[in-house]
Amino acid sequence: MKENQLIQLVEEMTIDEKINQLLQLAAAFYSDKAEEKTGPMSELGLSQETIDTAGTTLGVSGANEAKRVQKEYMQNHRLNIPTLLMADIIHGFRTIFPIPLALGSTWDEAAVEKMAEISAKEAAVSGLHVTFSPMVDLVRDPRWGRVMESTGEDPLLNSRLAAAMVRGYQGENLKEDNWRVAACVKHFAAYGGALAGRDYNTVDMSERQLREMYLPGYKAGIDAGAKLVMTSFNTVDGIPATGNQWLFRDVLRNEFGFEGVVISDWGAIKELIPHGVAKDEKQAAELAIKAGVDIEMMTTCYPDYLKELLEEGRIAETLIDEAVMRILKLKNELGLFENPYRGADEQAEAEVILSKEHREIAKKIAQKSMVLLKNENILPFTPQEKIALVGPGAQSQDILG
């Protein structure tokens, strides 16, 4: 689509359709198995219209399922706008690579870029469009529970590998290369700087430290062309990132020149309430949309309250229109208006995923990532020796790495 066609499409949308475009729902809402909608998902109280027009979907798995979800979604959408399928692909999709912390130990940009390229290929043939990676949160406290998702403590290495991952995931042209996916730099900002290493905790540092140590990784990913940025759960200078206009309007948009989509982390908009900056979901929606958060992930502050805020004059419709336009532009950059089933291919899925070539490359990168911290006559191994891998996770692919 040309940009004037996207503008016309926004003009044709009702206010409810616009607002729902800003909502991301889990794949369970589009499952043909009712039992999958359990726990918090069953308590959201969403109308069928909201489900049918929510703009993006989280966690669809497999080419066949991706095509089914996309087909039914477009049939139910009055304007036939496609959904956008996203997932966390952190260190491999089906072929598992070393964790990002180990990837940092390779000091090898080409290897990390190759990891991202293979991950994108496997994800794309399975029908996915966006990965929530790279995580470029600089971390210097080993007590933090997400250390393994970071590439380490060095700003330069962090930046170089962030850019390498973005290049690997996205390639040179997302519309023409259906075996690539859009990259989402996360978590903006300074999520890895939580006090005492406690996840979601306060981040308390000088602006100089923030700019010199923590922000360069995000900027490197953005300069490499990342299409999305995800908000962090923490506060920065006392203000939660998801409602922080200075972070997203002044720094991300104006200083860094980022023009892509900003998405909240899971439930982060509603979490503005326990942070103490919003008294209810309505105020949380107001703070987030004013800060520039385009997509709300898995809470319903936007669909429940943006229209009311608009009618009360507390927000301008241009805020909603700008967010919708950024989402539609991303869908257009991926070629979804022309090819809504982009990449999804059961035959390619069977041939590409866990291929011998991919597993061999993963093995070589794993070898590069290994660091012997203390050698007490361990090396070299003799051919007659065997190594036992034991423990509750030894056979678990879910926590491999």
Describe the predicted segments one by one.
Residues 1-401:
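Glycoside hydrolase catalytic-domain context in secreted enzymes
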